[in-house]
């Protein structure tokens, strides 16, 4: 991992060199961009990497407000923050997770899952706090109608656009991390599934101008995932601790219900009542019946798939639990053979011979015939 002292050196630009120094390489790239801000010739290009693009001034009653919309240049900004996320990933791994895992003495399989849950817990907790702050400051909680009113929501505030760029950067950085962390081949398909699922939903909400609904749904989803990974980490520390898993199981089903309800209310009923129902990609308007059905179908299929995986894992967990309980009952039900009582002769042993209490041998002496 990055930033640690190494005694072994690898050939320059070899596979092992890149894996062990990927965060240092990323730090050098970020430093080059920051140095570019110091010179007038390269400052404009450097700002392209750092700041969100496509800003526009919208006149208001008092003054002008700067808003943003999306475009191809967002890919450059996302790439820059992918590199920054890789650096933060390495810092969390080395200075937090590695120190904790050394004390727990985990196996290789559990160590891999511990690192995965540790990284995702840090991300989900920070994303929940960030998302909640954006939702409160934008006033989406106090005015639920704002989720579909004035659609399409083409113009975004700085914090909303930056939040979406940060989310896309994090989940895109997870793809090369599968290579950098040397994830086992058996774990790669499972991790690719939820990475692609997040990328699909976040990109869809961003490009289809459903950013307000996307913020609410991400807040619900991230809160549930944070509870799951927290329960998983506590389980590694104490295998008998199942309370957080039980709490997560209850919250998981409720979250699926809330997500489906919000999606149906916003897309199925809210957008259906908006007057502007014309398919116009140039203006960012996708409020037509086929588009709404496609959005709802995507959300419903994703939630049904997550619920099916949850039920399947819970049933497997219960089967394993009852097998262990039945095995314990069988062991306790097996009758033990009664212990044989050995009759001890009076006296004590000396050199393998039983002596009587008066010091003589307990064996009967043969009388010599006269």
Swiss-Prot record:
**Main subcellular location of this protein, as a coarse class:** membrane
InterPro entries per UniProt:
TLC-dom, Translocation_assoc_membrane
Q: Which GO biological process entries does UniProt record here? A: collagen biosynthetic process; protein insertion into ER membrane; SRP-dependent cotranslational protein targeting to membrane, translocation
Protein location: Membrane
Question: Region entry Disordered: which residue ranges?
Answer: 332-370
What keywords would UniProt list here?
Glycoprotein, Membrane, Protein transport, Translocation, Transmembrane, Transmembrane helix, Transport
Its function?
Necessary for collagen type I synthesis. May couple the activity of the ER Ca(2+) pump SERCA2B with the activity of the translocon. This coupling may increase the local Ca(2+) concentration at the site of collagen synthesis, and a high Ca(2+) concentration may be necessary for the function of molecular chaperones involved in collagen folding. Required for proper insertion of the first transmembrane helix N-terminus of TM4SF20 into the ER lumen, may act as a ceramide sensor for regulated alternative translocation (RAT).
Q: What is this protein called?
A: Translocating chain-associated membrane protein 2
Q: Which organism is it from?
A: Mus musculus (Mouse)
């Amino acid at each position: 991992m990055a930033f640690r002292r190494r005694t072994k050196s690898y050939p320059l630009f070899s596979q092992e060199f890149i894996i062990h120094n990927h965060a240092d390489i990323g730090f050098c790239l970020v430093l080059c961009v920051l140095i570019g801000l110091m010179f007038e010739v390269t400052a404009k290009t450097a700002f392209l990497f750092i700041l969100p693009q496509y800003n526009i001034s919208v006149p208001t009653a008092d003054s002008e407000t700067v808003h943003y919309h999306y475009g191809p240049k967002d890919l450059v900004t996302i790439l820059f923050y992918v590199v920054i996320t890789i650096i933060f990933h390495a810092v969390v791994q080395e200075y937090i997770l590695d120190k904790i895992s050394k004390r727990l003495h985990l196996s290789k399989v559990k160590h891999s899952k511990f690192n995965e849950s540790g990284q995702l817990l840090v991300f989900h907790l920070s994303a929940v706090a960030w998302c909640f702050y954006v939702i409160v400051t934008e006033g989406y909680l106090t005015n639920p109608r704002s989720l579909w009113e004035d659609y399409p929501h083409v113009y975004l505030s700085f914090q909303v656009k930056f939040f979406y760029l940060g989310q896309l950067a994090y989940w895109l950085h997870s793809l090369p991390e599968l290579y950098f962390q040397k994830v086992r081949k058996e774990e790669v398909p499972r991790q690719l599934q939820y990475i692609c699922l997040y990328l699909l939903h976040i990109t869809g909400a961003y490009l289809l101008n459903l950013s307000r609904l996307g913020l609410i749904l991400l807040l619900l989803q991230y809160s549930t995932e944070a509870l799951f990974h927290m329960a998983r980490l506590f389980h590694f520390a104490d295998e008998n601790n199942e309370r957080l898993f039980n709490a997560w199981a209850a919250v998981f089903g409720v979250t699926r219900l809330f997500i489906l309800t919000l999606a149906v209310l916003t897309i199925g009923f809210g957008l259906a009542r908006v007057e502007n129902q014309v398919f116009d990609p140039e203006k960012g308007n996708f409020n037509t019946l086929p588009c709404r059905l496609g959005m709802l179908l995507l959300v419903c299929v994703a939630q049904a798939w997550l619920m099916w995986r949850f039920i399947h894992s819970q049933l497997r967990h219960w089967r394993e639990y009852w097998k262990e309980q039945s095995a314990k009952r069988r062991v306790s039900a097996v009758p033990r053979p009664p212990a044989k009582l050995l009759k001890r002769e009076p006296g004590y042993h000396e050199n393998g011979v039983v002596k009587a209490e008066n010091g003589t041998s307990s064996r009967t002496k043969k009388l010599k015939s006269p």
